[in-house]
Amino acid sequence: MTSKGSQEEYDYLYKIVLIGDSGVGKSNLLSRFTRNEFSLETKSTIGVEFATRTIQTEGKTIKAQVWDTAGQERYRAITSAYYRGAVGALLVYDIAKQATYKSVERWILELRENADRNIEIMLVGNKSDLRHLREVSTDEAKEFSEKHKLTFIETSALDSSNVELAFQNILTQIYHIMSRPSHSTGPQTTIDSNTETIILPTTSEPPAAKSGCC
């Protein structure tokens, strides 16, 4: 299928949101995944921005629309529009800052209040390159993820570790869910943004066999 106003072809369009406290590296995760760029001078995001990237999974072309917003409290008024239409969320904390990890439960509550109840959530421990400054153990975060039924991964936007894998995994998980019969026979899903309304194509093909991912 071809997106309107673009020659780029894709089978599915999924909106993914990045959430978490300010300074955990959300903007650099976005730029590393979509443009393979990293900036040490990144300032706190003001308002909202999004970027897109197309990937292949199980023979399908998936276009990810990844949204980024500041985690600071004064910007929380935008949350309802920010979450609207999102089918996945990367909840990011800084492994070298315990306070950002302690905020994770609050972000989960905000997700539950504003996002679709079936949104796929991945907990992301970012800045894994700062292992010498680690304040949050991998085992603790894994245990938390299992308790809250989240997937979990540690990444580094600085050295690219697991950034590609994190997005690939959550997009594949969403594809498995969205290609089930209960999703493929219903009305088309739309993604609302401030700039355009995007139709999420449905599929008449049978769901792909589920494959494992971390």
Swiss-Prot record:
Family, as annotated: Belongs to the small GTPase superfamily. Rab family.
Motif Effector region, residue numbers: 42-50
GO (cellular component) term, any one: pathogen-containing vacuole
Highest taxon above the source species: Eukaryota
GO BP terms in the entry: cellular hypotonic response; contractile vacuole organization; exocytosis; osmosensory signaling pathway; protein localization to vacuolar membrane; protein transport; Rab protein signal transduction; small GTPase-mediated signal transduction
Gene Ontology molecular function terms on file: GTP binding; GTPase activating protein binding; GTPase activity; nucleotide binding
Annotated GTP binding sites: 20-28, 39-45, 68-72, 126-129, 156-158
Topology class, membrane: Lipid-anchor
PROSITE patterns (UniProt xref): RAB (PS51419)
SUPFAM superfamilies: P-loop containing nucleoside triphosphate hydrolases
UniProtKB keywords: GTP-binding, Lipoprotein, Membrane, Nucleotide-binding, Prenylation, Protein transport, Transport, Vacuole
Lipidation (S-geranylgeranyl cysteine): C213, C214
Coiled-coil residue spans: none
Protein name as catalogued: Ras-related protein Rab-11A
Gene3D superfamilies: P-loop containing nucleotide triphosphate hydrolases
Record-linked InterPro entries: P-loop_NTPase (IPR027417), Rab_GTPases_membrane_traffic (IPR050209), Small_GTP-bd (IPR005225), Small_GTPase (IPR001806)
Main location: membrane
Places the protein is found: Contractile vacuole membrane
